[in-house]
């Protein structure tokens, strides 16, 4: 029996979005869901207890970073990631592919894998499908990702075609190398850029290998939102309806709603903690850059419609003061609020699917948040 199972509960009559349950070895979680990112086995500044209190079900950790520090052997010795970081809900690990392609100045792609430089000290490293499986098997995540090539955006059709073919061959090698198929579910990653025929080829190749779940990769890499939505429109229908669908690296509120409408079940992004560290927060009325002088004497919560720990206890003026003074507590408060905001947004999305009104919810949310204004900012 596969360790990862998807159960479809309902399809929204208004939009076609899916309400479902993702069953994992560490619990069952409603989808569509947002997964906070804990790159180095921690969601920056937040404790596992706080994440639970917010309602997080699955969190993400990063294969590449944990391989370098502290080393997958140490995590394995600790009893796996769950035990190492004291998290008893779901964990998804990415394959390390994206980091190899985004962090390393120097890299050489060969059929057997990728040679690249360690971004910390410049040492030469080699990552292959087999190595990515070995690391993730040691980490013991509930969901592992296949090692794929992450092409740059934009890329030529010829480059993308070769890349898709290589990713399919690597996916097959990942399945063969996966040592714990009864404990950890391995997802395939559909690539192909913005080319419909290549997405189709990639999806067909991977579906024929019968993974327990599928990710759509190569989006949110700099392409316009319209391109991402168009690619999702022709890609998600190619994936099996009885398996979970995961859109990698996407976390802005508009893209979460638009992704769900296009049949996506799982999302992850560093966005809430990254912008939180810069003093930017998402609220029901749009984006607030808390460092701005106009908040110096604003003694109201970050978001008057939010009941998170931050909004129940602290004011914009106080949080602005902390952020301006580089106080860690300020970053904790903005990060807590932002992660909570996206987890609650997905609860609202699920409720709207239940009531067949996700299209109406989208209109209302976009209007309130300010996405409908000309020159609206991304998040």
UniProtKB/Swiss-Prot annotation:
Keywords: Glycosyltransferase, Metal-binding, Queuosine biosynthesis, Transferase, tRNA processing, Zinc. Substrate binds at residues 94-98, 148, 191, 218. Its cofactor is Zn(2+). The keyword Kinase does not apply. Its EC number is 2.4.2.29. It comes from the Bacteria. Zn(2+) binds at residues 306, 308, 311, 337. The active site is at 94 (proton acceptor), 268 (nucleophile). InterPro entries: ArchSynthase1/Queuine_TRR (IPR050076), TGT (IPR004803), TGT-like_sf (IPR036511), tRNA_ribo_trans-like (IPR002616). It catalyses: 7-aminomethyl-7-carbaguanine + guanosine(34) in tRNA = 7-aminomethyl-7-carbaguanosine(34) in tRNA + guanine. GO terms for biological process: queuosine biosynthetic process; tRNA wobble guanine modification; tRNA-guanine transglycosylation. Pathway: tRNA modification; tRNA-queuosine biosynthesis. The keyword Metal-binding applies. One of its GO terms (cellular component) is cytosol. Residues 249-255, 273-277 are annotated as: RNA binding. Binds 1 zinc ion per subunit. One of its GO terms (molecular function) is tRNA-guanosine(34) queuine transglycosylase activity. NCBIfam families: Q_tRNA_tgt, tgt_general. Catalyzes the base-exchange of a guanine (G) residue with the queuine precursor 7-aminomethyl-7-deazaguanine (PreQ1) at position 34 (anticodon wobble position) in tRNAs with GU(N) anticodons (tRNA-Asp, -Asn, -His and -Tyr). Catalysis occurs through a double-displacement mechanism. The nucleophile active site attacks the C1' of nucleotide 34 to detach the guanine base from the RNA, forming a covalent enzyme-RNA intermediate. The proton acceptor active site deprotonates the incoming PreQ1, allowing a nucleophilic attack on the C1' of the ribose to form the product. Belongs to the queuine tRNA-ribosyltransferase family. Homodimer. Within each dimer, one monomer is responsible for RNA recognition and catalysis, while the other monomer binds to the replacement base PreQ1. This is Queuine tRNA-ribosyltransferase. It comes from Anoxybacillus flavithermus (strain DSM 21510 / WK1). The gene is tgt.
